[in-house]
Curated annotation (Swiss-Prot):
Subunit field text: Tetramer of two alpha and two beta chains.
Taxon lineage: Bacteria, Pseudomonadati, Pseudomonadota, Gammaproteobacteria, Legionellales
Signal peptide annotation: none
Pathway: Amino-acid biosynthesis; L-tryptophan biosynthesis; L-tryptophan from chorismate: step 5/5
Gene symbol of the encoding locus: trpA
Native source species: Legionella pneumophila (strain Paris)
Keywords: Amino-acid biosynthesis, Aromatic amino acid biosynthesis, Lyase, Tryptophan biosynthesis
Protein name: Tryptophan synthase alpha chain
Length: 272
């Protein structure tokens, strides 16, 4: 069984909500990434999203764009990211790792080789932001051959027909994009988000995890009251880079934010 499914089953059995942090591989410097991954797991992460740096990250706001620029300045590419997963797996064989990014670097790498190497390294799935499921047939077949999961995006504007299509092709869970715009966007409107989320949830065979715009423990808890889980990216990267630039400990800073989110989510999750 894929680690993602094992984790989701365990969360369901324990009536807990998923917490998934996103970091960009190689940011702020390559030697920190594996330590960050372990720190986030210690601080309550259920699933890790590891970003593959790309020069044109169209769905990302300025925080993650700058993170990718910093990683690319260290010449971080697919092989480096996979090596980070390998290093992580030496001491953590259970936490799912999702590789998140854009199609171009993987296309250049070669779909079959990438899937083979990703699974060998210990990755469990991908989120390819610019590959809609309707155009993913070739990639999906390769991923299935190697046992790599495809995690797809859905949003408030996703139609019932498209949700039905996604249901037929997705694995694990769906990434529910809470806002129009880019990662790190402001102004989550919770009543509207809840109503739209529940519409998509009723149409989905898989758990829906909410990402985009979740910045604080309070916000994470409010979303987790109705959602299957939350994904945090830009807020976490802000903590990491601010600590690094202030010559403080990025591990402590990122761990503190994620621990506070974990605690806030668990405090409401036990009542759901």
């Amino acid at each position: 069984m894929n680690r993602i499914d094992k984790t989701l089953e365990k969360l369901k059995a324990n009536r807990k909500k998923m917490l998934s942090p996103y970091i960009t591989a190689g940011d702020p410097y390559p030697e920190l990434t594996v330590s960050l991954m372990h720190q986030l797991v210690k601080s309550g992460a259920d699933v890790l999203e590891l970003g593959i740096p790309f020069s044109d990250p169209m769905a990302e706001g300025p925080v993650i764009q700058r993170a990718m620029e910093r990683a690319l300045a260290h010449s971080i590419h697919c092989d480096d990211v996979l090596n980070m997963v390998r290093q992580f797996r030496k001491t953590d064989t259970e936490t799912p790792v999702i590789l998140m990014g854009y199609l171009n670097p993987i296309e250049q790498y070669g779909y079959d080789l990438f899937a083979q190497q990703a699974v060998e390294a210990g990755a469990d799935g991908t989120i390819l932001v610019d590959l809609p499921p309707e155009e993913a047939d070739g990639v999906s077949r390769v991923w299935q051959k190697h046992g790599l999961y495809s995690i797809y995006l859905c949003s408030p504007t996703t139609s019932a027909e498209r949700m039905n299509f996604i249901n037929q092709h997705a694995n694990g869970y769906l990434y529910y994009v809470s806002l129009k715009g880019v990662t790190g966007s402001d102004a989550l409107k919770l009543p509207e988000l809840k109503a739209q989320y529940l519409q998509r949830k009723a149409q989905s065979k898989l758990p829906l995890m909410v990402g985009f715009g979740i910045k604080t423990p309070e916000m994470a808890a409010q979303v987790a009251e109705f959602a299957d889980g939350v994904i945090v990216g830009a807020a976490l990267i802000n903590e990491i880079i601010e600590a690094y630039e202030a010559k403080k400990d990025p591990l402590q800073a990122s761990g503190a934010l994620l621990s506070s989110m974990r605690q806030a989510i668990d405090n409401i999750g036990s009542m759901v």
